[in-house]
UniProtKB/Swiss-Prot annotation:
GO-annotated molecular function: nucleotide binding; oxidoreductase activity
Cystine pairings recorded for this chain: none
Presence of keyword rRNA processing: no
Enzyme Commission number(s) of this protein: 1.-.-.-
Similarity comment: Belongs to the Gfo/Idh/MocA family.
Superkingdom field: Bacteria
Protein name: Uncharacterized oxidoreductase ORF334
Organism: Rhizobium meliloti (Ensifer meliloti)
Keyword entries, A-Z: Oxidoreductase
Length: 334
């Protein structure tokens, strides 16, 4: 199978620290070019990773006829603009999350996909990690009974005034930077969409972003998911899944490193003691590499993408409803 030739649009930290190194070790693709608005930054990244070509503008990399697909790690407010530009230039697109800032933006991207015939995917890398396949198998087996509640927590500390996460004007804040993860976890495990949400946010008085957002998501049949995301609380990543017979705790659900043995802890609820728990380990995996490989394989085979834009549209509807609820103080329909 011919390798899918990728260009990287931007030199964001997530690209240079996580995604590019993983893509370089992936099968079925090669990274042939990288672009930045600062040519020196592009050249430095190209030298660091042994990438053949570097460009000082995004337009230049889109004009490169050898590039078939692009990875976009730009700030949130630029995702849709450059994804559309890339698709119109004939490139397939793997774009960081959140894919858009609102439903209208994402609908325009879906229209662009349908018009151009290019493949466009949101980079929700957790879906590629095998620990989630193990979770789905456990839930489907009925071992934990009927799943009625899910809790997701993603907190970290980022007080950098230069960070895009702390710029409200470009889609920063805890909800848009971190909320995608626990929302994805709940939607994947329930295999359903929430109907209503209620949320509260605490705004940073200097940055103007939501530094803490909590939300309740009501799913069909009375099932519930709760989430807490923050950019100014001590680091914690956790997902709890509650069934009528057992509960599941994922100890590193979102950002396991390629050498992490992920732990899935099942508790039968018979007593509040460690003896009631069973730990299952999932072999280490590089979720960024797997994400890139599966995206590339879908391009070559013409098979469905691991995550289609319609699924991302569902995420966007939830994010927007949470934001409305936090602003208005009301339950909001998704």
């Amino acid at each position: 199978m011919d390798l899918v030739r990728f260009g990287i649009i931007g030199t964001a930290a997530i690209a240079v620290e996580k995604v590019i190194p993983s893509m370089l070790s992936a099968e079925g693709l090669e990274v042939v070019a990288i672009a930045s608005r600062d040519l020196d930054r592009a050249r430095a990244a190209a030298t660091r990773f042994g990438i053949g070509r570097s460009y000082g503008s995004y337009d230049e990399i889109l004009a490169d006829p050898e590039i078939e697909a692009v990875y976009i790690p730009l700030p949130n407010h630029l995702h849709v603009h450059w994804a559309i530009r890339a698709a119109e230039a004939g490139k397939h697109v793997l774009c960081e999350k959140p894919l858009a800032l609102d439903v209208e933006e994402l609908s325009r991207l879906i229209d662009c996909r349908d018009r151009t015939g290019r493949r466009i995917q949101e980079a929700v890398m957790i879906r590629a990690h095998p620990q989630w396949d193990e979770i789905f198998d456990i839930v489907a087996s009925g071992e934990i009974g009927e799943v009625r509640a899910i809790q997701g927590v993603f907190t970290e500390v980022n007080l950098d005034p230069k960070s895009i996460v702390n710029d409200a004007s470009i889609g920063g804040g805890a909800l848009y930077d971190l909320g995608v993860y626990p929302i994805a976890a709940a939607r994947m495990v329930f295999a359903a969409e929430p109907e209503r949400v209620f949320a509260v946010s605490d705004l940073d008085p200097v940055f103007g972003i939501d530094r803490l957002t909590s939300a309740v998501l009501l799913f069909p049949g009375g099932r519930q998911a709760t989430l807490v995301v923050s950019t100014q609380l001590a680091l914690r990543h956790n997902v709890e899944i509650f069934g009528t017979r057992k509960s599941i705790s994922l100890k590193n659900p979102f950002n396991p490193t390629p050498d992490d043995h992920c732990r899935i802890v099942l508790d039968n609820g018979s007593k509040l003691a460690a003896a009631a728990a069973e730990t299952r380990r999932v072999a280490p995996a590089d979720q960024y590499r797997l994400q890139a490989e599966r995206f590339s394989a879908a391009i070559r085979s013409g098979s469905p993408l691991p995550i289609e834009l319609e699924w991302s549209l569902g995420t966007m509807k939830v994010l927007n409803a949470i934001q409305r609820s936090a602003e208005r103080g009301n339950w909001e329909t998704v």
